[in-house]
């Protein structure tokens, strides 16, 4: 609208004179910074932001698991927070969550999926602190569990490990050593420490786990609309920006299209 008004009021096109002659008035610019709505979608187009490759993701999670064993083997209490962080990173990935969505999860946010009984009590996840648009409250969404190993990982944390945390009596899924919820700075620093220890690209951030979730679902053949709804995007274009398909995925996609085209061309009874 702003650009249209710029065009309409540009003296080079004489629209102002024509409107004044026909209607007795002339167009003016009506869209300014102070009355324009801010773009509320994620600005994720920066080229340095990307998803993990599958190999990078495996290396990151393997290191997180090994860190738990290393700390516990030394007889230190820090193995509980280490296991919490390892599980938290996995949950952030398997549900495609943002950082704050992850840290604000409660024990009661998991539920059953009637169409996915094999997941038991962990068939769905209620995200209560989704990204809020300007002037609005947090947007909620319910995410479906996709991978079969997810329930076991969560159940182990909730039933066997979390009760040993000092602040485990609260509702938060991820209590810290000092309070009912782990802090943002702690998550960022732990993630960076693991990433650097494995020797991964510094461009990978905690949010890259969400990007990886989107990318891997698309690569595995899930419907783009399903993926969009899982991660709470209003627009398919935002989901597309998040998708960082590998060269192998693009090659396979092209091969599939070419094979289908050739098969259709050779189908008996086809007329040119």
Specify the residue positions occupied by each region the protein language model found.
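Short, charged phosphate-coordinating catalytic segments
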Residues: 10-19, 92-121, 225
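C-terminal catalytic core of Y-nucleophile DNA break-rejoin enzymes
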Residues: 46, 133-155, 169-191
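C-terminal secondary-structure termini that scaffold catalytic or DNA-interacting sites
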Residues: 257-272
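Conserved tyrosine-mediated DNA breakage-rejoining catalytic core shared by Y-recombinases
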Residues: 24-30, 104-153
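Short, basic (Lys/Arg/His-rich) helix/loop patches that form interaction surfaces
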Residues: 71-75, 188-229, 233
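Basic, Lys/Arg- and aromatic-enriched nucleic-acid-binding interface segment
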Residues: 59-99
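Catalytic-site neighborhood detector that most strongly recognizes the C-terminal catalytic loop/helix
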Residues: 231-257
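Non-catalytic DNA-binding core/recognition domains of DNA-processing enzymes
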Residues: 1-22, 81, 146
């Amino acid at each position: 609208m702003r650009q249209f008004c710029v065009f309409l009021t540009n003296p080079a096109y004489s629209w102002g004179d024509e409107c004044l002659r026909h209607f007795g008035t002339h167009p003016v610019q009506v869209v300014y910074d102070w009355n324009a709505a801010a773009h509320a979608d994620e600005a994720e187009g920066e080229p340095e932001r990307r998803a993990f490759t599958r190999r990078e993701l495996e290396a990151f999670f393997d290191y997180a698991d090994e860190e738990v064993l290393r700390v516990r083997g030394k007889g230190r209490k820090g193995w509980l927070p280490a296991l919490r962080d390892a599980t938290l990173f996995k949950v952030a990935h398997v549900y495609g969550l943002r950082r704050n969505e992850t840290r604000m999860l409660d024990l009661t946010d998991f539920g059953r999926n009637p169409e996915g009984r094999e997941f038991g009590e962990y068939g769905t996840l209620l995200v209560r602190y989704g990204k809020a648009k300007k002037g609005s409250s947090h947007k909620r969404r319910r995410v479906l569990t996709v991978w079969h190993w997810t329930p076991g990982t969560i159940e182990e944390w909730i039933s066997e490990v979390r009760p040993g945390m000092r602040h485990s009596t609260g509702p938060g899924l991820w209590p810290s050593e000092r309070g009912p919820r782990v802090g943002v700075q702690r998550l960022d620093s732990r993630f960076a420490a693991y990433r650097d220890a494995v020797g991964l690209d510094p461009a990978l951030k905690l949010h890259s786990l969400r990007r990886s979730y989107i990318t891997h679902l698309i690569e595995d053949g899930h419907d783009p609309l399903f993926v969009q709804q899982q991660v709470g995007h209003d627009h398919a274009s935002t989901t597309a920006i998040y998708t960082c398909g590998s060269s192998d995925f693009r090659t396979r996609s092209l091969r599939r299209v070419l094979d289908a085209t050739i098969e259709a061309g050779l189908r008996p009874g086809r007329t040119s």
